[in-house]
Curated annotation (Swiss-Prot):
It comes from Trichomanes davallioides (Kilau fern). SMART domains: AAA. This is ATP synthase subunit beta, chloroplastic. Belongs to the ATPase alpha/beta chains family. It catalyses: ATP + H2O + 4 H(+)(in) = ADP + phosphate + 5 H(+)(out).
């Protein structure tokens, strides 16, 4: 016996539905509206119950456009929250918020599904040991290391290499950790989603010939979708990632691009749901909404979800409630700098602006900590001397400062690295550098062992041995 109600009111993406007494659906239940509009086109809309209004009515948010819906149409209560397919079958395919494939590769086997609303792992299941998540990218591992099961904010404007960095991470976790990735595109441009998909196919992160060999599942709810979809697509992606962590016991990377759009979508429907706005017009439930998403991203004793979230900062105001609420959850930040990208230093991660709570001697060890501090001090000094160099030239500096500048320039170049997914642009094969090799390399530069090598030798190489080899070949070319 189906529980059927009728639409009583529609305001944009929000609609009210009346059910018979005693038959009210639960909050977060998914409702289906099927039928035809006056033009005879099929209507198939899924909604999610948000409020019980009393008088046997509920208020729900639609996951797709509400065009063509009318009062009095029948609404079926499915009796359960929205469920999406999970497991290996999701790899290599693109899904929407409802878990339907949208890549025209045919239907997906939905024998295993999970509801998108699940409680966070119990405190007793959490992995309390702090460990570093090695990415194989020198600048990240040395100066702002990621925490296994942590949350990382990725800041950067357009065209500084966010996408390439994301793809390299997806590639490296698959190679080094045997892990998989889930990419949640939340309220970003459809064109970017398409570009990412094409680039992933090109760099073999998605294997077209053998889809099951792919390393990533994509979930998109882009800018053109109604707010309901953008508000929930993050949970859909997270649910797919949780399956890999809890059932397959793997290390998972979860990308959310962009976490701000998740908050924005919530604020779009908040007023329509009749809630009082809070600061700057955001939803009063901002902290809770963010918390319920973020608390599910964590390490358990079985596996981990490490999440990398692109953070858009509205009007560059870091005190805006949306980014400010996000910061409370982050373990590390990776800041991309346009200045470095302009110099051709990729990945253009700003070594002085990027931070990590993991960079403590008792977590990473004295050696790593000292090396990182040394690198930062050298770069900071170089930054301070830049005005003097610009006005007076290098010759006016003291002997000590000239040495610092020379080492800083070597460090700056050594922080660049050829990526596997960017072999097309750089023409040199990608390099994965282990943390031990990274620390060794920077220690050698700081100690002055390599003062006699030209700075070009450090540009776009993997470990320090490659730099010495490159120096020799440069010398041969010079002769």
């Amino acid at each position: 016996e189906k529980n059927v109600g009728q639409i009583t009111q529609i305001i944009g993406p929000v609609l009210d539905v009346a059910f018979s007494p005693g038959k009210m659906p639960n909050i977060y239940n998914s409702l289906l509206i099927k039928g035809q509009n006056p033009a005879g086109q099929e209507i198939n809309v899924t909604c999610e119950v948000q409020q019980l209004l009393g008088n046997n009515e509920v208020r729900a948010v639609a996951m797709s456009a509400t065009d063509g819906l009318m009062r009095g149409m029948n609404v079926v209560d499915t009796g359960a929250p929205l469920s999406v397919p999970v497991g290996e079958i999701t790899l290599g395919x693109i899904f929407n918020v409802l878990g339907d494939p949208v890549d025209n590769l045919g239907p997906v086997d939905t024998s295993t599904t999970f509801p998108i609303h699940r409680s966070a792992p119990a405190f007793t299941q959490l992995d309390t040991k702090l460990s570093i998540f090695e990415t194989g990218i020198k600048v990240v591992d040395l100066l702002a290391p990621y925490r296994r099961g942590g949350k990382i904010g990725l800041f950067g404007g357009a065209g500084v290499g966010k996408t390439v960095l994301i793809m390299e991470l997806i590639n490296n976790i698959a190679k080094a950790h045997g892990g998989v990735s889930v990419f949640g595109g939340v309220g970003e441009r459809t064109r970017e989603g398409n570009d990412l998909y094409m680039e992933m196919k090109e760099s073999k992160v998605i294997n077209e010939q053998n889809i099951s060999e792919s390393k990533v599942a994509l979930v998109y709810g882009q800018m053109n979708e109604p707010p309901g979809a953008r508000m929930r697509v993050g949970l859909t992606a997270l649910t797919m990632a949780e399956y890999f962590r809890d059932v397959n016991k793997q290390d998972v990377l979860l990308f959310i691009d962009n976490i701000f759009r998740f908050v924005q979508a919530g604020s779009e429907v908040s007023a329509l749901l009749g809630r009082m706005p809070s600061a700057v017009g955001y939803q009063p439930t901002l902290g809770t909404e963010m918390g319920t998403l973020q608390e599910r991203i964590t390490s358990t004793k079985e596996g981990s979800i490490t999440s990398i979230q692109a953070v858009y900062v509205p009007a560059d105001d870091l005190t805006d409630p949306a980014p400010a609420t996000t910061f409370a959850h982050l373990d590390a930040t990776t800041v991309l700098s346009r200045g470095l990208a302009a110099k051709g230093i990729y990945p253009a991660v700003d070594p002085l602006d990027s931070t990590s709570t993991m960079l403590q001697p008792w977590i990473v060890g004295e050696e790593h900590y000292e090396t990182a501090q040394g690198v930062k001090q050298t770069l900071q000094r170089y930054k301070e001397l830049q005005d003097i160099i610009a006005i007076l030239g290098l010759d006016e500096l003291s002997e000590e400062d000239r040495l610092t500048v020379a080492r800083a320039r070597k460090i700056e170049r050594f922080l660049s690295q050829p990526f596997f997914v960017a072999e097309v642009f750089t023409g040199s094969p990608g390099k994965y550098v282990s943390l031990i090799e990274t620390i060794k390399g920077f220690q050698m530069i700081l100690s002055g062992e390599l003062d006699n090598l030209p700075e070009q030798a450090f540009y776009l190489v993997g470990n320090i041995d490659e730099a010495t080899t490159k120096a020799v070949s440069l010398q041969v070319e010079g002769q």
